[in-house]
Amino acid sequence: MLKSSLLYKIINGIWDMCYIWKTEMRNVFRDEGVLIFCILVPLGYPLLYSWIYNNEVVREVDTAIVDLSHSHTSREFIRDYDASPDAKATYYCNSLDEAKQLVQKQAVHGIIYIPSDFDTKLNRGEQAHVGVYCDMSLMLTYKAIYQTAQGVASHINSGIQISKGGGFTDRDDEITTEPLAFDEVPIFNTTVGYGNAILPGVLVLILQQTMLLGIGMAAGTSRELNRNRELIPVSKHYGGIFRIVFGKAMVYFMVYAVLGMYLTLVVPKLFGFVSMVTWTTILGFLLPYILSCIFFGLMLSCLVRYRENVMLLVVFTSVPLLFMTGISWPQSNIPGFWQGFSWVFPSTFGIRGFLRISSMGASLADILPEFRALWIQTGVYFLATCLVFRQQLRSARLKANLTAEVAEEEDEAEEIVENG
């Protein structure tokens, strides 16, 4: 077979792609850092996170009480708060600073602060305030303290309304405090727990973040090992853009296709979270999501000069990305700029789509906007990755003292293969 024939070039390109795949796959399992982020963290971290929030609710959360009012109403507030199943008045402090020290020592998870003018304002018919300070390192304790304080305040407000309503019968009092009777029935998150609300989004975010960490760390290793400190080594097997992009992408797709099914199907079942996922829907959904994450990571890998840099670029973005999806913070309250900025990341549409699939039993037709957005991101980031790797390939050739004519000839040959 002539080396100049199109068939030979295609076969040679496929062979080089398989060689790159084999090399990258071997590096994933030999590099301890990449192995940890691409294999061990996706396997272990979801189990730890799910175990923490498996109970859905916590009981008897320790709370410090700062009562500067010392009135009948403030004592009623504290008594009702302590009688609730979710919170417990553990310490009584004389000042807010004393209560803060207890929070710093982890003796309590929150503070109830009742100011000195609390009862005075109530007697004047003015609005009184009760301060609630919560430790947000664990959302379950924050939820228990905040909702308990809110419930007690609503109960006291009802008593004040009854006393000022002037009703003659119990029915009059009921109408005063609750003019419209309603039953609150949770439709999807039946446990009204933090795990069912947030965990699906966290699982999908873990896929993206660990993938970015793994790809970035592998890119940093490549630069450190290559003699010219370039992302792409000078080798006959790394002679074309498509073979490099597809060879690298195949590695992470094979790994994360398995991990994606593990995170979306196995982990929720292990811990009894609400999961209405079907095989066909999740397979169709994970395909564009994993591909968009891969090409997004490969595109950003050109920014990584050293292995440690990727930690600074990725880790600190996890919490903001989760907030910008709108599952833990109302999407309607997110400014338009940040909503537009969140569209850059595949996790935004991935989390929104998977949450509807997992909690609401949605099909691909029901999440069509997110599904289309992921495919658009896949196409855009694939083209961007090809452009970035083309520039990296030319830079590596020139630094290796290859003439511009040789580089141009190889590029023309690659274009023939690509057009064929």
PLM segments and residue spans:
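Extracytoplasmic/periplasmic domains immediately adjacent to an N-terminal transmembrane anchor
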Residues: 1-196, 366, 391, 397-420
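Alpha-helical membrane-protein architecture signal
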Residues: 14, 18-22, 196, 237-250, ...
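Loop-to-transmembrane-helix entry motif
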Residues: 28-35, 206, 247-253, 257, ...
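Hydrophobic core positions of alpha-helical segments in small-molecule transporters
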Residues: 37-38, 200, 246-247, 310-313, ...
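Hydrophobic alpha-helical transmembrane segments of integral membrane proteins
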Residues: 38-39, 196-197, 316-317, 342
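Hydrophobic alpha-helical transmembrane segments of multi-pass membrane transport proteins
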Residues: 44-47, 185-268
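Membrane-spanning alpha-helical segments of multipass transporters and channels
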Residues: 48-49, 70, 91, 254, ...
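Hydrophobic alpha-helical segments typical of transmembrane helices
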Residues: 73-77, 148, 215, 295, ...
